[in-house]
Amino acid sequence: MMPDFTQQGTANSAVSPAAPVAPVVYFNGVSKSYGRIHALSGVTLGLSGGVTGILGMNGAGKSTLFKLLMGKLRPSAGEVKLFGVDPWKNPSPYAKVGFVPEHEKMHDWMTALEFVSTFARLHGMTRSEAEQEARRVLDFVGLSDVINKEIGRFSKGMRQRTKIAHALVNDPELIVLDEPLQGCDPLARTTIMNVIRELGKLGRTVLVSSHILSEIERITEQIVILHQGKLVALGNLHAIRERLDQIPHTIRIVGDDARALAKDILSPPAVFGVSFPNDHELLIQTYHFGRMHAELPRLIVDNGHNVRLIDNPDDDLESLLHYLAGGEV
């Protein structure tokens, strides 16, 4: 059974229940198979409002999920709905959707303004309306100073932001971004993350896929985790972190004198294992991951240690999946 990480409050009995509102994105028992290969198996979820990270290793089913959502694939079983409507019966919901695919399909000879305004025209805008909207969204993604530059001369990060701008030109209520940070330099990643967070604050429903846990953590707390085509977790990342405290974690500290450091900072029962790969490196095994990280800075400073690095070798998506999938990773 998939772990339930949703956090629900208590209903107020004095308030009459409101009419149910269909989620923006709804999958009900959705599967997609290619012969004996199951790309997605029995996925059920409903998403509305804010930013949700779609996490999974390569081949987990993230792109299949998005292709089903965008009508590029028909489900083998189950139903997919957008804004309460089956898009295979009525494609009108796609007028309210912006999609940023993983792979680039851009016209390098066009300027950013020409590229984005062309898509605005395809949404039925007049030439002047299209240019106005193109300028607005290019400014929103931080490209206002290069709107007349050819896309072929753009960096990877600038190209990604141009793709995001083209997906926003119709002012969509749902924005779907497939691996938007892949291949970007640190500055571009930070800029794109800021854009995604801002879209969530504006009340849009934003789905962003990644295979890197730390990327999603910097964008949102709401996540969906896929593994081998199955939904293994859905909900708040902090709740998942609390569950992870039930299993041992490794903390790696690199400093001038690993053994002296261990003597000053280690205190049972927080720590149940210690090892020294070399004179400068200390590995700590603990069940109290959050507590250790909260106490380490004070203990290091109070005891005058010179520490160059603190990291968590097992604090990644693969380790998280290993726990959620019962070790089958």
Predicted features along the sequence, with ranges:
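Short, charged/small-residue-rich alpha-helical element at the C-terminal edge
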Residues: 249-319, 324, 329
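Conserved ABC transporter NBD signature motif
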Residues: 78-93
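Catalytic Walker B motif of ABC-type/P-loop ATPase nucleotide-binding domains
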Residues: 175-179, 184
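Conserved ABC ATPase "signature" region
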Residues: 117, 121, 128-146
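Walker A (P-loop) phosphate-binding loop of ABC-type ATPase nucleotide-binding domains
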Residues: 57-61
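ABC transporter nucleotide-binding domain
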Residues: 193-285
